[in-house]
Amino acid sequence: MSHQPLSCLTEKGDSPSESTGNGPPHLAHPNLDTFTPEELLQQMKELLTENHQLKEAMKLNNQAMKGRFEELSAWTEKQKEERQFFETQSKEAKERLMALSHENEKLKEELGKLKGKSERSSEDPTDDSRLPRAEAEQEKDQLRTQVTRLQAEKADLLGIVSELQLKLNSSGSSEDSFVEIRMAEGEAEGSVKEIKHSPGPTRTVSIGTSRSAEGAKNYLEHEELTVSQLLLCLREGNQKVERLEIALKEAKERVSDFEKKASNRSEIETQTEGSTEKENEEEKGPETVGSEVEALNLQVTSLFKELQEAHTKLSEAELMKKRLQEKCQALERKNSATPSELNEKQELVYTNKKLELQVESMLSEIKMEQAKTEDEKSKLAMLQLTHNKLLQEHNHALKTIEELTRKESEKVDRAVLKELSEKLELAEKALASKQLQMDEMKQTIAKQEEDLETMTVLRAQMEVYCSDFHAERAAREKIHEEKEQLALQLAVLLKENDAFEDGGRQSLMEMQSRHGARTSDPDQQAYLVQRGTEDRDWQQQRNIPIHSCPKCGEVLPDIDTLQIHVMDCII
């Protein structure tokens, strides 16, 4: 057992029991005794600044993540709204195209009927004048109604086609066609003069990028121009329809006048009496009636031409309808054949969810930091309140001192001065006692720190002693095992020695018995007797017990009890 002094721990820097409390075991704590207070303050300030910088970096990162998340959410909402808008537009376009197809079929049938009637009227105009009055009036009424209906349907068709073109332009399809509709000033019914299709480049909708402000402004200006042009066209068409209605009214009035004149003529023909003046008027009457009928025929032919123009415009509208149907089919194909876009959207939704979770975690961390900052703010507010109170008390004390000085200067009552002096003495005594208590506390703290240091040293030394004890115990166990082995070997050797001695004695006895007469000298007998006594003493020494204490000589039965006794005896 090796007794090491307390100074051995300071000399041995690599004790096996030393280990750091925090951090990895290969990093040791810095020795605070080597640093000065100023260096410690500087390190604390540096740590505080680094902490502040890290907080600011976390805040900036949180703000950036929020901005990205808001941008992604806005982009996804825009994508959803645009998709819904495109779907609704495609449905409306399909419905309107179906309605337009039905209306076109009806108009074709009506135009065929009108063509047949106009051809009949152009082939035999003399027969039309001979028709009965009732049939002529019915045909005129039918023509008027058909003309008004055709005009209204033309205006509706033009408006629907323009709306469809505008909606297709605004839907952002793959073939972004720009349609310009201009109305001719000299036409009677506001027919479409030019429909220009300018094929634009295909758009590639890039993820994460929004439309620029200039493009939006140009698009809005173009929409406003097209709407204003359509409104002007509709106004002109309405005005022309009103003019045609007025012209039809005038023609109707003329027809009624001619009917009256014809009735008067029939009455004049039935009468037997007539004058030459009346005959001249009668001759002039049919001529005027024929001229007016020719004018009506011209109006009918002009209306037929207008109907032909409407037919051509309807054919153009059918072509536009086919193009629109093709575009709708292309849009449907795009909407149906976009699995990759759906996968991308799913990935975006997954990333959005991840970002939402990250933002929620960051928000929770921010809330924790805000709660900590609020606690610190409350503590600071409490400290400020206490500081303000202390300042107020200090100011009050200063004021009282000033008042006392004034009273002393003015030689106020000595009793008050005595009381104040006594109070001051008591306060000084209290301060001195408190200072003494503080000094005592500092001394006790220093002693406790020293005791703690000594305790740590003692603990380390105890661990060293324990390790030495265990090492010595293991060595003793090994020595005990070796002793047992040696004892066994001794026993074997002693047995062999006894056997050899017995054999020697027997051989001696035999020799003595053989040579008894020769060796009768007394000296030789005495030598043999002495040798026998020495052999007995050596056997007695050999029979000494092995388990005995080396210090006090106490004999013990076992090696374990011997070790315990040796530890107690030595310590």
Curated annotation (Swiss-Prot):
Intracellular or extracellular location(s): Cytoplasm, Perinuclear region; Golgi apparatus; Golgi apparatus, trans-Golgi network; Cytoplasmic vesicle, Autophagosome
Keyword Kinase: no
A Gene Ontology term for the protein's cellular component: trans-Golgi network
Motif (LIR): 176-181
Alphabetically ordered keywords of this record: Autophagy, Coiled coil, Cytoplasm, Cytoplasmic vesicle, Endosome, Golgi apparatus, Metal-binding, Phosphoprotein, Zinc, Zinc-finger
Species of the source: Macaca mulatta
InterPro entries: CC2-LZ_dom, NEMO_N, NEMO_ZF, Optineurin/NFkB_EssMod
Domain observations: The LIR (LC3-interacting region) motif mediates the interaction with ATG8 family proteins.
Ranges in a coiled coil: 38-170, 233-502
SUBUNIT field: Self-associates. Interacts with HD. Interacts with GTF3A. Interacts with MYO6. Interacts (via UBAN) with ubiquitinated TFRC. Interacts with GTP-bound Rab8 (RAB8A and/or RAB8B). Interacts with TBC1D17. Interacts with TBK1. Interacts with TRAF3. Binds to linear ubiquitin chains. Interacts with LC3 family members MAP1LC3A, MAP1LC3B, GABARAP, GABARAPL1 and GABARAPL2; OPTN phosphorylation increases the association (at least with MAP1LC3B). Interacts with RAB12; the interaction may be indirect.
Compositional bias of kind Polar residues: 201-210
ZnF segments: CCHC NOA-type: 541-571
Tissues where the protein occurs: Present in aqueous humor of the eye (at protein level).
Binding site for Zn(2+): C549, C552, H565, C569
PROSITE patterns: ZF_CCHC_NOA (PS51801)
Region (Interaction with Rab8): 58-209
Biased composition (Basic and acidic residues): 100-143, 186-197, 255-268, 275-286
Residue list for modification Phosphoserine: S177, S198, S336, S520
Residue interval(s) of motif UBAN: 468-473
Lineage: Eukaryota, Metazoa, Chordata, Craniata, Vertebrata
Region annotation (Interaction with MYO6) ranges: 406-514
Region (Disordered): 1-32, 100-144, 186-210, 255-291
PTM: Phosphorylated by TBK1, leading to restrict bacterial proliferation in case of infection.
Molecular function via GO: K63-linked polyubiquitin modification-dependent protein binding; zinc ion binding
Function, in words: Plays an important role in the maintenance of the Golgi complex, in membrane trafficking, in exocytosis, through its interaction with myosin VI and Rab8. Links myosin VI to the Golgi complex and plays an important role in Golgi ribbon formation. Negatively regulates the induction of IFNB in response to RNA virus infection. Plays a neuroprotective role in the eye and optic nerve. Probably part of the TNF-alpha signaling pathway that can shift the equilibrium toward induction of cell death.
Keyword Zinc-finger: yes
Protein name (record): Optineurin
